[in-house]
Amino acid sequence: MKGSSESSSRGLNNTSGVSEFCTDGSKSLSHIDYVRSLLGSHKEANLGGLDDDSIVRALECEDVSLRQWLDNPDRSVDAFECFHVFRQIVEIVNAAHSQGIVVHNVRPSCFVMSSFNNVSFIESASCSDSGSDEDATTKSREIGSSRQEEILSERRSKQQEEVKKQPFPMKQILAMEMSWYTSHEEDNGSLCNCASDIYRLGVLLFELFCPVSSREEKSRTMSSLRHRVLPPQILLNWPKEASFCLWLLHPEPSCRPSMSELLQSEFINEPRENLEEREAAMELRDRIEEQELLLEFLFLIQQRKQEAADKLQDTISLLSSDIDQVVKRQLVLQQKGRDVRSFLASRKRIRQGAETTAAEEENDDNSIDEESKLDDTLESTLLESSRLMRNLKKLESVYFATRYRQIKAATAAEKPLARYYSALSCNGRSSEKSSMSQPSKDPINDSRQGGWIDPFLEGLCKYLSFSKLRVKADLKQGDLLNSSNLVCAIGFDRDGEFFATAGVNKKIKIFECESIIKDGRDIHYPVVELASRSKLSGICWNSYIKSQVASSNFEGVVQVWDVARNQLVTEMKEHEKRVWSIDYSSADPTLLASGSDDGSVKLWSINQGVSIGTIKTKANICCVQFPSETGRSLAFGSADHKVYYYDLRNPKLPLCTMIGHHKTVSYVRFVDSSTLVSSSTDNTLKLWDLSMSISGINETPLHSFMGHTNVKNFVGLSVSDGYIATGSETNEVFVYHKAFPMPVLSYKFKTIDPVSELEVDDASQFISSVCWRGQSSTLVAANSTGNIKILEMV
């Protein structure tokens, strides 16, 4: 409705002769000439500071027609708002009259209102004598601007199209508006004059203060207005306005006020003063609101900075407390060192019979050795300092995470104690007894008394203990007649004496580790070689029976071998698809677990040769592992990006589900009884604390290890004494420590071109398997070409 009334008020043609303006000199001006002279008079009178572009801006903006605004059924009368609108139109008419021009078109359809209630007079087709394209073109040329001409032409053509679409009642209202705003003398055939404009101002004033809800009522009210009959509500609610309106609507032109009398009247000036006061108050209120907004902004910034300052102060306090604890420990250790030295010195003084010459020679030799050791120590210290500074930010984040986690745990432990002592107090127990039984130290303070130092210091020392991975031996064991020598799995026996490899060449090869290290040759032959019918995916040694090895293959078969006898012991074929992983229980060496692409985990008894339990899931199982301390629980990783931890006594539901990876979980390994690490093809390893699960869900890993590349292949995972080894698709081996998320060491396999014998970068090669030699610093790694290296952290 709004759109239709607006377009109609701007687009309806009429024939009432409203495009010419009669003056006392009987001169006539086109409507555009009038507008331009009106704008000029506004400039002179400082009534708006308008220019020719103001019309263009008025036409470009979708302002609300004054007719549309008046006919809005939801409009309520705001006296100041109505006076503000009326005064603006009076000033426009006065500007025209001061130049001897009769406006004639003082009608709501010829004015538009902005969102700020600023009124503008527009040249509308509804205010034009002719709707022809020729007249429109002539008028648009008079603007004198090609931009204005183009906008006006497009506007008129659009309005003419919209007029055709307008419903008949809207056209009727605009036609009726013409009759409402026609003065008595014009009805009698007289020419319009300035008094006629005064009459039209009276009609407009009446419309401003008399809103009507329906068109029928509007028509009746305006017909009565022709006879100066006003509705009772306007006489009751707005008596002063009604009286002034009747003066402007006097049937005799000579009895109407002139424009100067109108401007000097108390009716115009008093509301203007009130309006100015109101505008000043509104401006003051706006400025106050702006200041409040600025103040709120500053308070918000201050609050955030204060929170940051408080947090920084807490951090500094925590650091100061920790520094004090470390200094105290250092003083205690130094005192112990002095005691040991004094004890050794007293024993040395007993040896009085030693020869002086021999002692001097020995001292010379010792001094040389000490200088050498000092150089090595200095070099090691500089290296450690360099690595410390290079990873300072990450070490810092781990330190604070460790401390806050410990404080949080201490706070949680304090709450039940506080409730307990509160209950004792409520039960009437003596405060003396309570104070005697209550611990003297706050758990939070206890957590700050050095409980964090040993674990963090141990991790830091282990992180800085080694500087590189050194190659101890190279092993080329690939078959010349086999096109693929990818090693899928490596495993050491219980004593770390032998290691086995298994891969797509369908063979299990057993090597003696020490003989390979001592022998400088590149090519080594296995001490035992076992042949399988299918490609092998996994291998595992029995921790109790030294010669027993289990393997899994691509056909879904689990096999148990006797290495000493070089024969197959048993074969289990219950899986329907490829088996990716197998693992023996260290606590129960007769128990074996396997995970398959068929979505199941099977538990096997090697004595019975059949499965004794099955855990069925909805996704492929890529890895399984028992914790070393018990055979009653099992962890496995799945293609659904999750890690599951089961109590095998209740295999229906997982004890804990670890959620955090974004792609397939390819490996899981236990670091200790309550911590495990998982590897995924999302380029990360994640360390999980099994005790941190809430309602069986753990979504917060202790660390996410990043540095290696792993997006599509299985690259291996092995754990030893807190060190975590994994492969990378960059043909590198990475070693992490459980305490920190960044790599400790890395080593890249070199690829030598057999023709040029030069080192080349082969992007297709990747590390396919890694395995620690027990709890030592020795690591065996193999890549996708079958190249095996024995590495050592030094």
From Swiss-Prot:
What does the record list as coiled-coil region(s)?
A: 272-326
- Residue ranges for the region (Disordered) are 126-165, 352-373, 428-447
Locate the compositionally biased regions of type Basic and acidic residues.
136-165
Name the GO terms of the biological process aspect: photomorphogenesis; red, far-red light phototransduction; response to blue light
Entry GO terms, CC: Cul4-RING E3 ubiquitin ligase complex; nucleus
Q: Which Gene3D superfamilies match?
A: Transferase(Phosphotransferase) domain 1, YVTN repeat-like/Quinoprotein amine dehydrogenase
Q: What induces it?
A: Up-regulated by red, far-red and blue light.
Effect of loss of the gene: Reduced hypocotyl elongation in blue light.
- PROSITE patterns recorded for this chain? PROTEIN_KINASE_DOM, WD_REPEATS_1, WD_REPEATS_2, WD_REPEATS_REGION
Q: Which UniProt keywords apply?
A: Coiled coil, Nucleotide-binding, Nucleus, Phytochrome signaling pathway, Repeat, Transferase, Ubl conjugation pathway, WD repeat
Annotated WD repeats reside at: 482-521, 531-571, 574-614, 616-656, 660-698, 707-746, 762-794
Short sequence motif named DWD box, residue ranges: 635-649
Q: What does this protein do?
A: Repressor of photomorphogenesis in the light. Probably part of the COP1/SPA E3 ubiquitin-protein ligase complex.
Q: How does it assemble?
A: Interacts with COP1 and CO. Binds to CRY1 in response to blue light, this interaction prevents SPA1/COP1 complex formation and thus avoid COP1-dependent degradation of the transcription factor HY5 by the proteasome and promotes hypocotyl elongation.
Q: What is this protein called?
A: Protein SPA1-RELATED 4
The species is: Arabidopsis thaliana
Q: What is the lineage of its organism?
A: Eukaryota, Viridiplantae, Streptophyta, Embryophyta, Tracheophyta
